[in-house]
Amino acid sequence: VTILINGLPLVQIELKKRGVELKEAYNQIQRYHKTSFHGLFDYVQLFIISNGVNTRYFANNPNGGYKFTFNWTDAENIPFNDLSKFAYFFFDQCNLGKIISKYIVLHEGDKCLMVLRPYQFYAVERILERVQNSNKNGYIWHTTGAGKTLTSFKAAQLVSELDGIDKVMFVVDRHDLDTQTQSEYEAFEPGA
């Protein structure tokens, strides 16, 4: 199934029967990449794979591997595994448009697309809400390897686009973290 947005094929869905492993759907997409849909897949931003009871999404990055497929969750981190629950939120016109237009990042260094995971999406949304509607402070907590740099980059990028925001500062407590963050930001967007 291909979803067109403004006439462009931006989302491709691979559906399998109940009981079929999701990795089969993922592998099918990889075969399509290699043998069938070269031109079409140049436009696709997101892939969805489902067997009805398990549903995952991932960015169009043929070198990413199955480990970069993710469950969608609600803001309380409850997964939407069932296709109908996933579709109800994810394919809502506003949500799908927002995910594609704001929450996919081209990693310039690796020349690959990255899509934020649900907790990153909700964290950035809460940061934007807080900046727009409050003068109170706040914090976002991530564990090691959870994508803190990508979350902070996307939050800084979107906050900087808000009216009345002239500068976004990123404060770190170690020199090596400053170097690492600057390098990653530069890979996400040169000059960031």
Over which residues does each language-model region extend?
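ATP-dependent helicase/translocase motor core
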Residues: 1-191
